[in-house]
């Protein structure tokens, strides 16, 4: 829960907040704002490539340097946190354990929070981050807000209003089964089931998912893949040099529209949808050309209700750090 926004923030020393993704880690020293309503102050933001470091401890040790006064750290990361504090995730290049980090870095406290749970705590900071309004009214109704974004995996969380003290519900929506609507999508899912018993949503809606969809399309058309990375597929689609690359992004956006619509109905997210993550800002043009909105609204009689739900694309940027910091400050205040 979030404390009264007009109340003075607790007197908390500076701490470190990190947003840990499958590709990058963003880290900052954070100073608490004077009131709970004010955004935390990010004093020194740095970005690290995961592939360049053998562990998160190495990254944080490099960042901390001579900052011996910093004793606490909060980490936003994808995955499911077990009761012993370790994180179950398929998207990080190394294990993540707060006990190990605390020992390695000689810190007093290391806290973990789901990455999209942290992002949900930054909802009040998102207006300035809006890149694109995709559908729905400019002003949303009061109600739960859905945050969702494909990156190395697919993150999702729900922000629920609660008389000025909102509740954030983290989810593992990316691990739910990938639904199919069209005949082509059914063929793609059937092909993906050839070597697995479960096709999760993030097997299509993620950076690696773009490559999975592309390879499946190539297999269905008996064509050898010409590209070996999501970036190469996106560049070929943007250049108009490869029909299958363009079709891959079309399928990706269609899946996204359907799944966002499904989640809005499941969670009653009448307060709107924020699309984040590291991929979608790079796919603005394919998203605008796609059937995203049509698929989002294609829910039978419920399509009319979905017309009143705004869907916005935001630039994730430093919001993961801000959200992690807000989560930590809220934890200290309650």
From Swiss-Prot:
Cited InterPro entries: ATPase_NBD (IPR043129), Bacterial_glucokinase (IPR050201), Glucokinase (IPR003836)
Amino acids binding ATP: 18-23
Pfam short name (any one): Glucokinase
Record key words, sorted: ATP-binding, Kinase, Nucleotide-binding, Transferase
GO molecular function (one): ATP binding
Keyword Lyase among record annotations: no
Statement: the UniProt record of this protein carries the keyword Nucleotide-binding: yes
Superkingdom assignment: Bacteria
GO biological process: glycolytic process
UniProt GO cellular component terms: cytosol
Family under the similarity heading: Belongs to the bacterial glucokinase family.
The protein's name: Glucokinase-like protein XF_1460
Native source organism of the sequence: Xylella fastidiosa (strain 9a5c)
């Amino acid at each position: 829960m979030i404390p009264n926004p007009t109340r003075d923030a607790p007197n908390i020393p500076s701490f470190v907040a990190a947003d840990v993704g499958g590709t990058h880690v963003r880290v900052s020293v954070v100073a608490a704002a004077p009131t709970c309503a004010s955004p935390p102050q990010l004093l020194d933001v740095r970005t690290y490539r995961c592939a360049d470091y053998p562990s998160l401890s190495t990254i944080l040790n490099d960042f901390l340097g001579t900052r011996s006064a910093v004793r606490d750290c909060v980490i936003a990361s994808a995955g499911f946190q077990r009761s012993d504090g370790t994180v179950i995730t398929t998207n990080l290049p190394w294990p993540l354990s707060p006990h190990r980090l605390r020992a390695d870095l000689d810190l007093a406290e290391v806290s973990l929070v789901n990455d999209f749970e942290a992002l949900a705590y930054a909802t009040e900071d998102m207006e300035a981050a809006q890149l694109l309004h995709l559908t729905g009214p400019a002003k949303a109704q009061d109600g739960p807000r859905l945050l969702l974004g494909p990156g190395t995996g697919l993150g999702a969380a729900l922000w629920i209003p609660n008389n000025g003290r909102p509740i954030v519900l983290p989810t593992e929506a990316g691990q739910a089964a990938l639904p199919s609507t069209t005949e082509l999508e059914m063929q793609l899912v059937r092909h993906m089931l050839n070597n697995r018993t479960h096709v999760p949503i993030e097997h299509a809606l993620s950076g690696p998912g773009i490559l999975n969809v592309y390879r499946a399309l190539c297999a269905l058309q008996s064509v050898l893949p010409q590209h070996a990375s999501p970036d190469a597929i996106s560049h070929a689609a943007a250049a108009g040099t490869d029909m299958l690359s363009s079709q891959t992004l079309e399928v990706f956006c269609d899946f996204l529209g359907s799944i966002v619509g499904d989640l809005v109905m499941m969670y009653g997210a009448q307060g709107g949808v924020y699309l984040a993550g590291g991929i979608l800002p790079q796919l603005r043009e394919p998203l605008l050309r796609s059937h995203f909105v049509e698929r989002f609204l294609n829910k039978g009689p419920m399509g009319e209700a979905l017309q009143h739900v705004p869907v916005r694309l935001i630039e994730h940027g430093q919001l993961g750090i801000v959200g992690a910091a807000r989560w930590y400050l809220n934890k200290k205040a309650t």
